[in-house]
């Protein structure tokens, strides 16, 4: 059963999806948002955030601010996984675990999924030394011995960046 037609559907409620939702809501665009996990779930897992203007501390702290802003702006979020998005005439039909939704436009902000390194004991170092982004976290390892593990050119580019920190 289709609930109603929306002007825009936003898939993913990380920083990109939240920003899009805030701007659209401010312009009185009728939106519906979908997030299969919790709002800003990846952000909340960050150990330390020191590169986001106006926010200091943990990723949990930043995620808390994001959630407060979503609530303050009364942004509707359906906690459900989007299974299929299909164009049907002038509307997109969005199928979720909760049902079907129609929207005139769709913004996809699903982010990325990091590959597991598949190193024994990797889980025990989460938030305690394993990082997946030299630009994001490199400063945390300034003047320390580190190892870079990766695939092809990406690992080389990250290692070169870390040389200058």
Model regions: which residues?
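FAD-binding core/adjacent interface of flavoenzyme oxidoreductases
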Residues: 1-11, 77-144
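Short glycine-/small-residue-rich flexible loop motifs, especially phosphate/cofactor-binding loops
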Residues: 21, 40, 67
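Alpha/beta-hydrolase active-site loop signature
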Residues: 38, 50, 114
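Short beta-loop-alpha junction of Rossmann-like oxidoreductase domains
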Residues: 41-43, 116
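N-terminal Rossmann-like dinucleotide/flavin-binding domain of flavoprotein oxidoreductases
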Residues: 44-100
């Amino acid at each position: 059963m289709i609930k109603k037609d929306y002007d825009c559907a936003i898939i993913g409620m990380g920083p990109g999806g939240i920003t899009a939702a805030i701007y659209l809501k401010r312009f009185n665009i009728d939106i519906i948002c979908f997030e299969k996990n919790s709002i800003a779930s990846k952000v909340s897992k960050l150990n330390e955030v020191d590169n986001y203007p106006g926010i200091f501390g943990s990723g949990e702290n930043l995620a808390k601010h994001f959630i407060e802003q979503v609530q303050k702006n009364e942004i509707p979020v359906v906690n459900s996984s989007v299974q299929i998005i299909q164009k049907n005439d002038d509307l997109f039909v969005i199928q979720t675990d909760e049902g079907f939704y129609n929207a005139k436009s769709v913004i996809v902000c699903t982010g990325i999924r990091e590959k597991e390194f598949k190193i024994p004991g990797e889980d025990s170092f989460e938030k305690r030394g394993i990082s997946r982004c030299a630009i994001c976290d490199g400063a945390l390892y300034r003047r320390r011995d580190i190892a870079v593990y990766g695939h092809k050119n990406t690992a080389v580019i990250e290692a070169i960046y870390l040389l200058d920190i």
